[in-house]
């Protein structure tokens, strides 16, 4: 009969092995679930920001909304257009533009073919780009108008939020919609190019066109270039009805929820097999000792 201490050591080793297996499975599950769950959480926050903005604007007096839009048009007319460069002395004025709700949200952008509906914020600070789409200072405010070009940028490839991850899937002819104040502006994709970060020539104004350019990093995960997707203003009536709150189910999120029970079942199976390895051997030893007695 083995000493009692030896038996306790073996049991302790088995317990440690079980705990290690459980910890390993839980860690793997958390690593697997983090991207889709974080993306789902951020999507809900972005959706809430869009809904909150639209509700707040709808409650404003029409005269107040028109006044803010008139101020934005005057700002665009006087703007020395230079993407990414705005004198510090002009920053306060810029931040006051399109401030309908007392927040930094100046509007929303919807890309129906990608299931994207995001708030647009002033500046391209990192905190902004983690939360939604940023407007590049020094470019036209996104209110439309011939001879203007608003440049909007978003992150691509964040594990916690999709944002502009699928921007490369847009094709010429696709539509995106900008909502700011009581204006709803549709743009049809006309140009898609890749440039170096320093090549800002592709972002210049065109006197007879009303343009919005969407910018993100490319190639995916390498980010040495910039993908520029430019849309030209089109009649909203030609686009048809677009629901602002259209629902799309992320297949990655579905896969994550399907994976949870699979992980749990796998954990149970492994633990049972681990215990079954020990059980027959110890039972055999116990019976042989009993026979000797």
Predicted feature residues:
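Cationic-aromatic interfacial patches
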Residues: 2-12
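Solvent-exposed, low-complexity, intrinsically disordered
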Residues: 1-4, 284-293
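Alpha-helical transmembrane segments
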Residues: 261-276
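A general, composition-driven signal for non-globular sequence regions
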Residues: 7, 39, 266-267
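Single-pass type I membrane protein transmembrane segment
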Residues: 256-260
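Solvent-exposed, non-transmembrane regions of membrane-associated and secreted proteins
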Residues: 11-254, 279-289
């Amino acid at each position: 009969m083995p000493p009692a201490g030896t038996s306790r050591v073996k049991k302790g080793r088995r317990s440690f092995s079980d705990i290690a297996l459980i910890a390993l499975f839980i860690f793997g599950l958390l690593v697997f679930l983090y991207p889709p769950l974080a993306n789902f959480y951020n999507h809900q926050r972005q959706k809430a920001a869009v809904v909150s903005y639209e509700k707040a604007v709808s409650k404003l007096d029409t005269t107040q909304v028109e006044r803010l839009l008139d101020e934005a048009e005057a700002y665009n007319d006087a703007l020395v257009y230079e993407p990414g460069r705005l004198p510090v002395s002009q920053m306060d004025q810029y931040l006051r533009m399109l401030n309908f709700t007392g927040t930094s949200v100046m509007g929303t952008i919807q890309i129906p073919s990608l299931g994207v509906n995001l708030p647009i914020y002033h500046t391209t600070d990192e905190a902004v780009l983690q939360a939604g789409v940023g407007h590049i200072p020094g470019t036209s405010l996104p209110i439309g108008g011939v001879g203007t070009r608003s440049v909007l940028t978003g992150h691509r490839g964040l594990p916690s939020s999709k944002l502009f991850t699928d921007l490369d899937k847009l094709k010429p002819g696709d539509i995106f919609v900008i909502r700011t104040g009581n204006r709803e502006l549709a743009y049809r994709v006309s140009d898609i190019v890749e440039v170096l970060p320093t090549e800002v020539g592709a972002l210049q104004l065109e006197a007879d066109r009303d343009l919005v350019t969407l910018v993100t990093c490319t190639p995916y995960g390498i980010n040495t270039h910039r993908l520029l997707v430019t849309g030209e203003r089109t009649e909203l009536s030609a686009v048809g009805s677009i629901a602002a709150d259209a629902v799309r189910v992320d297949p990655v999120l579905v896969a994550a929820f399907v994976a949870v029970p699979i992980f749990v079942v796998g954990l149970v199976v492994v633990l049972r097999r681990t215990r079954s390895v020990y059980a027959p051997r110890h039972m055999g030893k116990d019976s042989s000792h009993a026979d000797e007695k």
